[in-house]
Regions:
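A short, highly charged nucleic-acid-interacting micro-segment common to nuclease
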Residues: 233-247
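Alpha-helix capping and helix-loop boundary segments enriched in small/acidic/polar residues
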Residues: 168, 238-242, 271
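Secondary-structure boundary elements
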Residues: 161-236, 363
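Solvent-exposed residues in well-ordered beta-strands and their adjoining turns
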Residues: 158-160, 283
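Low-complexity, Gly/Ser/Thr/Pro-rich intrinsically disordered linker/tail segments
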Residues: 33, 75-90, 302-366
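Short, charged/polar, Gly/Pro-enriched secondary-structure boundary elements
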Residues: 78-81, 163-165, 286-290
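Hydrophobic/aromatic-rich core segments of domains that either
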Residues: 245-315
Length: 366
């Protein structure tokens, strides 16, 4: 590599390639100032640096210059490429961390660390409703105050159990969803708009709310749960128990198996704003509807007050960042519409092996 006009340019090139040693010749500034200039020209390099040292040789009598033999230690957890580092000038969009339901780890160089923390808090609901099994963010930050005013933030994720085990349980849940639909439908072929009710009816009748898991979360919201099962689709679909997260993911698994667009929503209940509550948005015939399977679980029947509801009705009991989710304006396919359809056509489905328990629950509660 040839000598660059400016020593900081040669240093930048060496650091991009993660070279452990570099020689800087004919320098008129201290090695610290050269590092400062390099990090000012390419702020992303701060994410690579662990430490540095330099031996020097003084040259010249009238105009003193230095030759530096620089050694550089790089962070073991540094990104593999400089292109994987994001620079934040105050306008970083935290929602880019979550793409297609998969959380993306990120190394961020920023002068706005306080804003970063605020932005991560603001999208916590999106994280919880997009990524099954994620408990929260894990952020590690460091600075080199003598070299840069920037902070390096490495953003990763806490999972409620090891990711390999999580994937295993998710695979079992997907298989269980197939089995559940067979037990509900038999050989009958029902319209898509009926299936959200059948999934809702199944979950609310066959599963129980795990009060112990809820009490643990209520007492210590920041710690990892001792029992992750109620937080996953695996809980309701296989062990038939869960809290709101588990029921929402289970409902989504059933909708995925039925090829119906469905997502989770993280917010809270108006009656208890301290704890996250998770439910679903389901899309039927181009319109979104809210479905809260947890709310439907009652000892004396199936409660349909939060089944296939628009935003305007859901606001009475639930709170969520509405701007972060699709607007639910659907009105047509509410419970009354589905009930009328099943009253007229249900016997045909029963003749094909459909399970009467889920098509016609003994007790419906408004």
């Amino acid at each position: 590599m040839g000598q660059s006009t400016h020593p900081e340019d040669l240093l930048i090139s060496a650091m991009i390639d993660k070279e452990p040693e570099v020689r800087l010749e004919h320098c008129f500034a201290s090695i610290q100032d050269i590092f400062k200039r390099a990090l000012n020209k390419d702020r992303r390099l701060l994410a690579f640096l662990s430490s540095y040292g330099a031996r020097y040789m003084k040259k010249g009598l009238i105009q003193v210059a230095y030759d530096y033999d620089v050694t550089i230690q790089y962070r073991e957890q540094a990104p593999s490429s400089i292109d994987d580092v994001v620079v934040d000038d105050g306008d970083w969009d935290a929602s880019t961390l979550i793409k297609k339901g998969t959380p993306r780890e990120l190394t961020l160089v920023t002068s706005y660390y306080d804003r970063v923390s605020e932005k991560l808090s603001e999208i916590m609901c999106i994280l919880l409703s997009s990524c099954e099994g994620v408990h929260g963010f894990d952020t590690v930050c460091f600075v080199f105050e003598n070299l840069s005013s920037d902070t390096v933030c490495t953003i990763s994720y806490d999972y409620i159990l090891p990711q390999q085990k999580l994937r295993q349980l998710q695979g079992q849940s997907a298989f269980a969803a197939k089995t559940v639909w067979k037990s509900i439908l038999g050989k009958s072929k029902v319209p898509q708009f009926v299936k959200p009710f059948l999934a809702f009816s199944y979950l609310t009748q066959e599963c129980c709310f795990d009060q112990r898991a809820y009490d643990e979360m209520e007492n210590d919201r920041s710690s990892q749960p001792t029992d992750p099962v109620p937080y996953l689709a695996y809980g309701p679909l296989i062990e038939r128990r869960g809290i709101s997260a588990g029921f929402a993911w289970a409902f989504k698994a059933l909708m995925d198996e039925a090829n119906i667009e469905c997502s989770c929503v993280a917010g809270c209940l108006r009656e208890d704003t301290k704890i996250y509550h998770i439910w679903n948005l389901v899309k039927i015939d181009g319109q979104f509807y809210h479905v809260d399977p947890t709310w439907g679980i009652k000892e004396n029947g199936v409660c349909i007050s939060t089944f296939m509801q628009p935003d305007s009705m859901m606001r009475g009991t639930h709170l969520w960042y509405e701007e972060k989710y699709p607007a639910a304006k659907g009105l047509r396919f509410d419970y009354d519409y589905i009930e009328d359809f099943l009253a007229e056509n249900g016997n045909e489905f029963l003749d094909d092996g459909a399970n009467e328990t889920y098509f016609f629950p003994d007790e419906i509660i408004d």
